Swiss-Prot record:
Top class in the EC scheme: hydrolase
Cytoplasmic side: 1-749, 795-872
Annotated InterPro entries: G_GB1_RHD3_dom, P-loop_NTPase, RHD3/Sey1, Sey1/RHD3-like_3HB
PANTHER family, A to Z: PROTEIN SEY1
Protein's UniProt name: Protein SEY1
Length: 872
């Protein structure tokens, strides 16, 4: 599109060539240029905020409006050729002031205001549009809605005329101003009508021309049809007026330039002097012509959007509502600023969100270092940047959008904050558990007593301090969600629960250690008691200290020993549990479990002693001690005249009485089972299912077990008793037969004639010995030695020593024989053949031994596993 006859509309390229003549805001086809914002950015107006001013110029076509602007503001609007009369400016053009300062020739030179934007509006009354006044009205409405100052360019000789003085255009301006004011009831926007009278000769004073124009303007205002409530309004309620005269540009060029320079000094910030008022009480303007009340309060970065919205309403013949447009602009710009702010916010926060999400996905939340400061800085910068850019817009919309932005930011920061607290919570619990466990193990390794409650209290304090430190570091000031007291309370509660669980675990380990001690003590003591059953001897065969205990009081001794051992264990448990800060209920549960577990240990030990092989062996030993030894504990040497049958019967019957005695756990004093149910006691009210799940049911104590106390105390059933009786009798019968044979063998082994034959054949030797003093003395010494050895019961040790010496001599002889054979080839061959046969025999025997040993090991492993599984 060719504009103004010689240059095209501005594109997207930001360069001086495209913007030499400014930017065409609206073309002659009433299309708005979307590149207005690019031009404002190019001219560095966008960051100015409210520090900019907008001036529009009105006037008839070909009256020198563009020439005036170019001279006054240094712009380069296209001007009409001197050789032809035609339309030059089409649509509405905009350019930034290029003349920053007035000429320096004056002493009171005044700097022009920054960022003055000048709009060159298409002239009125042109032949190109003819009677079509639609664009004239729309452009006037657009200029009035956006501009602070409206420059009316007229010639001096047109003052007093209606069309020539643009009174028709001004009537349009007044009408659209009333439309705007009718919509905007919250404020009273004012504008400045600045009449620049061209070709001013000075013949008619400027004041007279001013009065004429004001009279015409008041007449036009009074002729307007005003909305309800504004019938008595005055033109000065909405407009201020200023006047200036300029000489002819061609006939008085030097004076024209000088007056333009003077006029430019008025385009700066001014103020009203309350001490100087006119007849209507309006304060006079001092300084420049730009008053704050003229400004439309549209930030520079939103002007392009605002202007486009205004023009869209105008061109579509919709009622122009400036407050609504300002709110729409505020919403648009605040959303745009919010998006820009969130981009920078994302760059600062997204890495932390990614790290946190990755750690959570991996199942190992981590406390992120520097998160708190990063969140504070990101939030502060985001809100500050938003305030800087958006606070210039509509206050209500700005506050609403700021609240929305803060909600978006805070929702993400809150998620990070809670994730940080969750990670600190989890890591703190883990570190607390590990620290307490490590401290307990260290105390156990040192072998010294340690105070578990003190360890838990110390580590809990450190854990809470660390959590609070990490929580404070993640706090974002001035946010409600940064209060971490609820999370801290939950963390403290979890620490209490974990501490309680660790205390319960430690008490279980304590109970296990005490239980092992009980197992060891009971194992040794019960072994001694049951081993005493296998010894039926008295006298020299009795125990080393004291008399042989009564077999009838076996269970009394076992029960007393059991109760004393467990009482000692309870004392140890209670003393150690006091350092755990355990409650009375927890100690009661621990003692109750200890008693039940201890009974299980005793029951298992008794069952082990009552195994068929063990009990049968003890019965045989008891019988043999009573049968083979006399009341003094001396072994019996059976002779044919001994009453073996009666001795056998007494010993057998005495031993048989042990079977019913051992079959039931009964106290001799009461002839009743021990009070196990009262001794164990009722289940504590504080006991949990977890405390009971690993306990073995006890008859007479647990009602759900279905067994009575009598059944619980039955150690050998009736069937097993009968089997033991039968097998024991068979064993006793074998011992009796052996004794009987021994007695009979002593008679038949040496016939009587043997002694006569021995005397007859050995008479010479007897006489020789008796006559020879040396032989007689040797015989006497040997006889005395043999007698003494017999009296001291040393024949057995002497025989064993002799056998050991002979075995040692045999082994030494074999070794020397092997050394001799290894020295010759023949011997080596013989040894090789012998070793081959021995290897085969060894393999066969080894397989048998492995089977036998395997069975033993399996039994042993079973017993060991049972011991290891018996925990408290």
């Amino acid at each position: 599109m060719v504009a103004n006859g010689h240059f095209a509309g501005v594109g997207d390229v930001l360069d001086a060539k495209n913007y030499e003549h400014g930017v065409q805001v609206i073309d002659e086809e009433k299309e708005f240029n979307p590149n207005l914002s690019n031009y404002l950015s190019y001219e560095n107006v966008t960051p100015a905020g409210f520090n900019y001013h907008l001036i529009s110029v009105f006037g008839s076509q070909s009256t020198g409006k563009s020439t005036l602007l170019n001279s006054l503001f240094g712009t380069h609007f296209s001007v009409m050729s001197e050789t032809e009369r035609r339309q030059t400016t089409k649509g509405i053009w905009l350019s930034k002031n290029k003349r920053l300062k007035s000429d320096k020739g004056q002493d009171n030179q005044t700097k022009m205001a920054d960022n003055i934007l000048v709009m060159d509006v298409e002239g009125t009354d042109g032949r190109e549009r003819g009677e079509d006044q639609d664009f004239e009205r729309k452009s006037a409405l657009f200029a009035l809605a956006t501009s602070e100052v409206l420059i009316v360019n007229i010639w001096e000789h047109q003052v007093g005329l209606y069309q020539g003085a643009n009174m028709g255009l001004l009537k349009t301006v007044f009408e659209v101003n009333l439309e705007l004011f009718l919509k905007d009831k919250r404020s009273n926007p004012r504008s400045l009508l600045f009449f620049v009278i061209r070709d001013f000769l000075g013949t008619t004073p400027l004041q007279n021309l001013q009065n004429t124009l004001l009279q015409d303007l008041n007449r036009i205002w009074n002729s307007l049809s005003k909305p309800a409530g504004l019938e008595n309004s005055s033109i000065t309620d909405y407009f201020d007026f200023a006047f200036a005269g300029l000489p002819h540009k061609n006939f008085q060029p030097e004076k024209f330039v000088d007056e333009v320079r003077k006029l430019s000094t008025r385009f700066c910030d001014g103020h009203r002097d309350p001490n100087k008022t006119d007849a209507k009480g309006t304060s006079s303007i001092e300084g420049g012509i730009f008053l704050p009340e003229y400004h439309r309060r549209i930030p520079a970065d939103g002007f392009a959007v605002y202007a486009e919205g205004i023009w869209d309403q105008i061109v579509n013949n919709k009622d122009l509502d400036l407050p609504t447009q300002q709110e729409l602009l505020a919403q648009f710009r605040c959303d745009e600023i919010s998006r820009e702010v969130l981009v920078a916010f994302d760059e600062a926060i997204s890495p932390f969100e990614a790290k946190q999400a990755e750690a959570v996905q991996a199942g190992n939340p981590q406390v992120l270092g520097g998160l708190g400061s990063a969140m504070c800085n990101a939030r502060m910068k985001s809100v500050k940047n938003f305030d800087t850019e958006a606070s210039r817009y509509h206050k209500r919309v700005y506050q609403m959008k700021k609240s929305e932005l803060q909600d978006k930011i805070d929702s993400r920061l809150k998620a990070l904050f809670l994730g940080q607290l969750s990670a600190a919570h989890r890591s703190g619990i883990q570190e607390f558990t590990e620290s307490v466990t490590a401290a307990v193990k260290a105390g156990q390794k040192r072998g010294a007593s340690y105070d578990f409650a003190e360890i838990v209290t110390k580590e809990r304090k450190l854990a809470i301090e660390k959590f609070e430190k990490e929580a404070r570091a993640a706090v974002v000031e001035d946010t409600q969600w940064s209060n971490y007291q609820q999370e801290l309370s939950l963390y403290q509660k979890d620490l209490e629960n974990i501490g309680g669980q660790l205390r319960r675990d430690e008490m279980r380990r304590l109970a296990t250690r005490v239980g092992r001690w009980v197992r060891s003590r009971l194992g040794e003591s019960i072994d001694l008691e049951f081993n005493a059953i296998g010894s039926g001897r008295g006298g020299s065969g009795a125990p080393e200290f004291g008399d042989k205990p009564s077999e009838k009081s076996l269970w009394d001794r076992v029960w007393t020993l059991f109760v004393d051992t467990v009482l000692d264990a309870e004392r140890r448990f209670t003393e150690r549990a006091s350092s755990f800060d355990a409650s009375i209920d927890e100690v009661d549960v621990g003692l109750w479990r200890l008693r039940r577990k201890s009974w299980g240990v005793l029951r298992a030990k008794i069952e082990e002693e009552m195994m068929e092989g063990n009990i049968l062996l003890k019965l045989r030993e008891n019988f043999e001690d009573k049968f083979r030894y006399d009341d003094a504990g001396v072994p019996r040497i059976w002779r044919p005249n001994d009453d073996i049958e009666s001795i056998y019967t007494r010993a057998r019957e005495s031993t048989l009485t042990l079977i019913p005695l051992l079959s039931r756990f009964r106290l001799a004093e009461t002839n009743a089972p021990p009070p196990l149910d009262k001794w164990i006691g009722h289940t504590p009210s504080s006991a949990t299912p977890a405390d009971e799940e690993d306990l073995t049911p006890i008859g007479g104590v647990d009602e759900d077990e279905g067994k009575s106390l009598e059944e619980e105390m039955t150690m050998i059933g009736e069937a097993k008793k009968q089997d033991l009786t039968v097998r024991f009798k068979k064993t006793a019968d074998g011992v009796y037969v052996e004794a009987k044979r021994s007695a009979i063998g002593g008679i038949t082994q040496v016939p009587l004639y043997f002694y006569g034959l021995l005397l007859a054949l050995g008479w010479n030797e007897i006489v020789a010995v008796l006559r020879n003093p040396a032989y007689f003395l040797l015989l006497f010494v040997c006889a005395v030695t043999a007698y003494v050895t017999y009296q001291l019961n040393l024949w057995g040790p002497i025989i064993k020593m002799t056998e050991a010496a002979s075995q040692q001599a045999l082994m030494e002889g074999k070794r020397r024989l092997r050394e001799f054979l290894e020295a010759s080839d023949t011997g080596l061959q013989a040894m090789a053949m012998s070793e081959g046969r021995n290897a085969e025999e060894y393999d066969m025997s080894n397989m048998k031994n492995r089977k036998s040993a395997g069975g033993f090991q399996n039994n042993r492993s079973h017993i060991d596993d049972a011991d290891d599984d018996d925990d408290f």
